[in-house]
Amino acid sequence: DDLPDAEKQAIAELRVVHSAERSQYYVRPEMSYDEITFWQKSPTKSCPMVWTHRSGRKSLLLGATADYVIGLPVEESRALLARLRDWATQPRYVYRHEWQLGDLLMWDNTGTMHRALPYAVDSGRLMHRTVLAGEEPLN
């Protein structure tokens, strides 16, 4: 909502290719050839950079899987994605949960960028995905 109008207009019709491979570079920047080959087998998907929720609110589809913007040189594309991710993750837009025993968090996965911070392996983590009333298309 707060993105400058000129920026909104500039990105309104852009499409982003998302890939599982791209997300792995955040976890393992120095993947082996075999790891890269494995992740490259996953299909890519082209999505609009700006997605409109059925409520009318717009979201930026900029998760870790965002690889490049169609029609832009790779360097320019990745710089744009990084700049928009920096904008979207300013402290004023971030909710960081301080977990306590018994907590349950729910969010609309279609319009929310979410991350897990590193946590102790022995702390336990249980996640379920529930679809309450269908999925919204990302066309």
Where are these regions (language model features)?
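Non-heme Fe(II) oxygenase catalytic core, chiefly the N-lobe of the double-stranded beta-helix
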Residues: 1-104, 109-139
